[in-house]
């Protein structure tokens, strides 16, 4: 089974996360940030991952912004994806998906390469706050996820006006691309999808 669990506790955040890559899109998400909960629920649904997440951060009682929590949730999710994939035998490795979200169009391309990298081209300046969520943290979320999952990730907004729609398109396209990339290629069962024989940096 391709599953992973992480408990991450720091002076800034307390996070418990379980992940099943071969689930049915079920989720129980509680970060105390409504918009982030909504996006992670969409990520689970469109990737068919089962995700159970409870997260608390210093923004709840110290008057901090939720920067630490958002980044640490992404770190935890990335680590779980990497752990659950294990040796990556037989996976398709690559994923690409474009999502039209009303007036916005967003594409996510990724490679589970073991060489983490992020290209992020999206203009989220139209609305800097969505509830308790700082929209500028979207790029930091996906950077932390990519670097901890070992993914080369390119996110491109082709066009869009509504910041909510653009971010939702990002999460949905990421989910669909991940679903493609982690799926098993029946012609490559038991094989590492790399001419080098490994999927990691160096």
Curated annotation (Swiss-Prot):
The keyword S-adenosyl-L-methionine does not apply. InterPro entries: IGPD_sf (IPR038494), ImidazoleglycerolP_deHydtase (IPR000807), ImidazoleglycerP_deHydtase_CS (IPR020565), Ribosomal_Su5_D2-typ_SF (IPR020568). The keyword Cytoplasm applies. SUPFAM superfamilies: Ribosomal protein S5 domain 2-like (SSF54211). Keywords: Amino-acid biosynthesis, Cytoplasm, Histidine biosynthesis, Lyase. One of its GO terms (cellular component) is cytoplasm. It is found in: Cytoplasm. Its main location: cytoplasm. GO terms for molecular function: imidazoleglycerol-phosphate dehydratase activity. It catalyses: D-erythro-1-(imidazol-4-yl)glycerol 3-phosphate = 3-(imidazol-4-yl)-2-oxopropyl phosphate + H2O. Its EC number is 4.2.1.19. GO terms for biological process: L-histidine biosynthetic process. PROSITE patterns: IGP_DEHYDRATASE_1, IGP_DEHYDRATASE_2. Pathway: Amino-acid biosynthesis; L-histidine biosynthesis; L-histidine from 5-phospho-alpha-D-ribose 1-diphosphate: step 6/9. HAMAP family: HisB (MF_00076). Belongs to the imidazoleglycerol-phosphate dehydratase family. PANTHER family: IMIDAZOLEGLYCEROL-PHOSPHATE DEHYDRATASE, IMIDAZOLEGLYCEROL-PHOSPHATE DEHYDRATASE HIS7. This is Imidazoleglycerol-phosphate dehydratase. It comes from Lactococcus lactis subsp. cremoris (strain SK11). The gene is hisB.
């Amino acid at each position: 089974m391709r599953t992973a669990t992480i408990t991450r506790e720091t002076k800034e955040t307390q996070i418990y996360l379980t992940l099943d890559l071969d689930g049915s899109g079920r989720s129980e998400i509680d970060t105390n940030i409504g918009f982030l909960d909504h996006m992670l629920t969409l990520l689970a649904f469109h990737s068919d991952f089962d995700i159970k997440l409870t997260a608390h951060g210093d923004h709840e009682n110290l008057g901090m912004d939720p920067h630490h929590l958002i980044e640490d949730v992404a770190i935890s999710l990335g680590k779980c994806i990497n752990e659950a994939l294990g040796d990556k035998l037989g996976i398709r490795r690559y994923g690409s998906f474009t999502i039209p979200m009303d007036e916005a169009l967003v594409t996510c391309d990724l490679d589970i390469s073991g060489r983490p990298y992020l290209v992020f081209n999206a203009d989220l300046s139209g609305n800097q706050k969505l509830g308790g969520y700082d929209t500028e943290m979207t790029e930091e979320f996906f950077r932390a996820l990519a670097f901890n999952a070992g993914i080369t990730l390119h996110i491109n907004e082709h066009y869009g006006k509504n910041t909510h729609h653009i971010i939702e398109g990002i999460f949905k396209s990421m989910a669909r691309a991940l679903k493609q990339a982690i799926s098993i290629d029946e012609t490559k069962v038991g094989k590492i999808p790399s001419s080098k024989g490994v999927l990691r940096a160096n």
